Every structure is written in C-alpha cells, then in structure tokens.
C-alpha cells in the first residue's frame, strides 16, 4: 500500500512494519510471510518474553508466498493446483463484505494485553484500507487490485481461497502484489480481473460506496473508543 499522510499512530506503525517486511522484487525465493503473529510480536505492548511465541499465531491471519504454495489466513494451496487467480479492486473488496471478519474477533488465544493489541491492529488495518479506498475513490491514486479469488482444483469441483481483512491489507502493498503476481507467472498461473466486478458502475454507485466507507470510519472510531 502506498504511503498515506495524516494516519493515526496505529496505522503509521502498521504501515512502517509493512514497508520494513516487504519481499524482494520478482518471484519469491524460498518463502515470504507476514501475519497477525508478526504484528503482535512487533507491537510495543507485547512483552519481550512472548514475542517468539506469538509469532506462531500467523495462521490466524496473514499471507505466505512460497515457491510451492500460496497461503491466506492459514489455508494453503499449491501453485500446481491453482487454475487461475482473479483480482478485484480494493473498493469492491470492501464493498462486498471483505471487512466483516474483524481482527479483534479472531479466535486468538489469550496473552497479556491481548484486547489492546488486537484492537490496535484492527484499527490500523481498517484505517489503511479506508485511506487507500478514499484516495482511489477521489481519483488520487491508481486503482489498487488485490488477488481476491484463488481458484483451484478441489476434489469434486473448483474451489476458491480468498483473503480475510488482514491478508487484504498485506496484499494491498505494491511490493507484496508484485511478488505474488511474479511468483504466479513463474508457475504459469494467470492473474486476471474478475469478469463480474461490481465496481464497473462505480460512478453510479458513488453514494453507496461513500456510505460504506463512512460505516468503516464509524467502526474505526468504535474500536478507538472501546
């Protein structure tokens, strides 16, 4: 995600972490991952003695890209099984319920300051998504598209792997998207826009979109007050 100005302290911290942990350009070499465990471990409220342990929480939310597979929120699919990957605009992802699974509601085990740390990460993630979506809606940025549907060969039918809210924040970072798409290309997996993108008529639905963004803003304020 591109740098944003006027962010809250929580969002600025998360933005800095995303930039610090960006993958190298091109297809992934080995494995790259970033998730909720890394964020909890990096937060100032987390006791030092627990940082190594909370990193194991990444399977509750995050992204992993390896030479063999891609992983969203603990669910992994091998590149060899993937039929295609469809992208959606960040605004559409938000509009179609992508933020319904709040980070502070994840079934993460108790640890000291759990509520405060998860609340801070949730506020930060929502704020970054909201800032990017507003900038895009107002024409101030190029369209941000994230890999929203990883379609793969299931036992009986084609199945889909989709990112949760935290994974979407990570995938919205340009370096992560570039690494993801380059790795997909290296495995001859196509990455194409979804053909049923509901945002094709975004101009006609501007009021609805702004209403949705206002609702996300209200959720951020509620998390701040909680």
Segments and roles (model prediction):
Residues 1-62, 71-73, 83-226:
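Eukaryotic intrinsically disordered, low-complexity regulatory linkers and tails enriched in Ser/Thr/Pro
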Residues 76-78:
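Core beta-strand elements of the Rossmann-like FAD/NAD(P) dinucleotide-binding domain
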């Amino acid at each position: 995600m591109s740098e944003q100005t006027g962010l809250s302290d929580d969002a600025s911290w998360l933005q800095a972490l995303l930039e610090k942990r960006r993958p190298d350009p091109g297809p992934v070499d080995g494995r790259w991952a970033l998730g909720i465990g890394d964020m909890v471990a990096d937060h100032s409220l987390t006791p030092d003695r627990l940082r190594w342990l909370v990193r194991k929480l990444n399977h509750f939310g995050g992204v992993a890209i390896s030479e063999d597979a891609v992983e969203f929120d603990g669910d992994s699919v091998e590149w060899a099984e993937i039929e295609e990957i469809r992208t959606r605009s960040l605004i559409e992802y938000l509009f179609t319920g992508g933020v319904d699974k709040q980070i502070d509601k994840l079934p993460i085990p108790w640890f000291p300051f759990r509520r405060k740390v998860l609340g801070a990460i949730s506020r930060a993630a929502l704020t970054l998504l909201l800032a990017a979506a507003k900038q895009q809606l107002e024409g101030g940025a190029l369209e941000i598209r994230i890999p929203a549907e990883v379609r793969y060969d299931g036992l009986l039918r084609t199945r889909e792997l989709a990112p949760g809210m935290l994974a979407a924040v990570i995938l919205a970072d340009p370096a992560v998207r570039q690494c993801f798409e380059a790795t997909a290309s290296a495995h001859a997996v196509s990455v194409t826009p979804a053909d049923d993108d509901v945002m094709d008529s975004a101009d006609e639905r501007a009021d609805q979109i702004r209403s949705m963004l206002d609702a996300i803003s209200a959720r951020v304020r509620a998390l701040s007050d909680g």
